[in-house]
Structures are given as C-alpha cells and as structure tokens.
Design a protein with these regions (language model features):
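GIY-YIG nuclease catalytic motif and its immediate N-terminal context
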Residues: 1-57
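Conserved short loop/helix modules at catalytic or binding sites
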Residues: 55-106
Length: 132
C-alpha cells in the first residue's frame, strides 16, 4: 500500500451504529489527541484524505464530525460513503500521518499537516475527494 511509503499507520476503523443519525461510529487505538493527516482505506485503497483543519483539532475531534454529521456537507457525504461500504461488508480503516518535523520559511512556521493534504490528494487520487 502506497500510504505506508509516506509514513501512514493504521490507527482505527469505522463501524456501523444504527442508533446514530450518521449510522456510523469509530474506534481509535492511537493518535486520538494528535493533529494529523488522515486517510480512510477500503480494500487497501485510500478512498479519502483529510486533515485536522486547525491547530487545536485532534483526530478524535475530526472523526466525531463525521459521526455526528457536524459542519460542512462534506462530513455528511463522507459519512454516507463510509456507511455504504460497511453495509456491503467492507471494512473502512483509519490511517494517519503525523509529520514529525516543523519547517520554517523565512522565519514563518510551515503547517505540514495542511501543506501535505493537497499533494497527497494529487498523488493518491482518492475517489471520495472531490477533485477539480
């Protein structure tokens, strides 16, 4: 799987939970309180790449937005994609990349989490990410 070449590791998975409005919930076993780049993987293929969008958003916070259908329409759309896969008997795994280093450009801190999102989407072409 190409994700491992970039340093992604598996940290959890999505599960069906009919009592929730979204119909899905998640289990995380690592990186819950970290700010990361994440990917949803079905059949060893990255289907979606996203980020914890600001400096205080953790992985658990971000996954909760899909689970609770909070915020942008993207959260509902992706939750429905996850639910559809699970209903067809597929597993939807959660992988993360936590950049270790901090870069600077002329004295400015460079946000590697946000900075890696678009290049990864361009390289991996995950079908759930809206492109172009």
């Amino acid at each position: 799987m190409i994700l491992s070449e970039y340093g992604f590791v598996e940290v959890g998975e999505w599960k069906l939970k009919e009592s929730l409005r979204s119909g899905v919930t998640f289990d995380l076993h690592n990186f819950e309180k970290e700010r990361v780049v994440y990917a949803f993987v079905v059949d060893d293929e990255a289907k979606y790449v996203g980020v914890c969008d600001n400096t205080t958003t953790t992985l658990k916070d971000r996954m909760s937005r899909y689970k609770g259908l909070q915020g942008a329409g993207t959260n509902k759309r992706i939750a429905n994609k996850i639910k559809g896969c699970l209903e067809r008997g597929k597993s939807v795994k959660i992988f993360v990349l936590k950049p270790e280093s901090t870069l600077q450009y002329k004295g400015l801190n460079v946000d590697l989490v946000k900075g890696l999102e678009n290049p990864l989407i361009e390289k991996l072409k995950p079908e759930w990410n809206i492109q172009g």
